[in-house]
Amino acid sequence: MPKKIMTGIDVFDAAMERIEWVFDTFSSVCLSFSGGKDSTVLFHLMANIARRKKRRFSVLFVDWEAQYQCTIEHVTRLREMYDDITDTFFWVALPLTTVNGVSQVQPEWVCWEDGAEWVRQPPEDAITRASFFPFYQNAMTFEEFIPAFNHWFAREKGMVAAILTGVRADESLNRFM
C-alpha cells in the first residue's frame, strides 16, 4: 500500500511550485476542469500564475447534461472571470457514455444523446458538432474521450502539452502512483 512521504513543504506551496514548473516547461497547457472543488482550486492557482507570467492556457470542460444548475453557473462564472488568460475554453456537449448509478434497467447513459429528450439545452457556444474533434466517435466513453482529447490537443499545438487535472491525493493513496 502506498504511503505519503512528507517533504517539508505544505500542499499549497508544492502546488504553486509544480504549476510554475508546468508553465516554465510547456508552451501549451490545458486544465481538465469539472466544476468541482478540486479543479476549481487548480483553476484559481493556474490563473494566478498565468497572469503573473503573462501566459494563457486552455480549459476542457465536459458538460454531462444532467448537472446541477449551480455547477453550470459556477463554470460559466469562472470562464468569464478568467477569459483574459484562457486560450480556448472547450465546453464539450457531445454524446458520451457513462455509468448510470441510478438505474438497474439502464446501467449506462449517453448524455446529449441524439433523438433523446435532454434535461436542458447546452450553451450556444458549446461544442455540439461531432466533427469538431477528428477523434470523436458517437457515444464514446469519457475514459476513451479524455486520452484522445489529450493526444489531439498536443498535436494541434504542434508540441508536447501539459494537461492538468485537480485531484486531491488524500482522496485515494493510489493517486500517488
Language-model segments: residues:
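ATP-dependent adenylation/nucleotidyltransferase module used to activate substrates
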Residues: 1-177
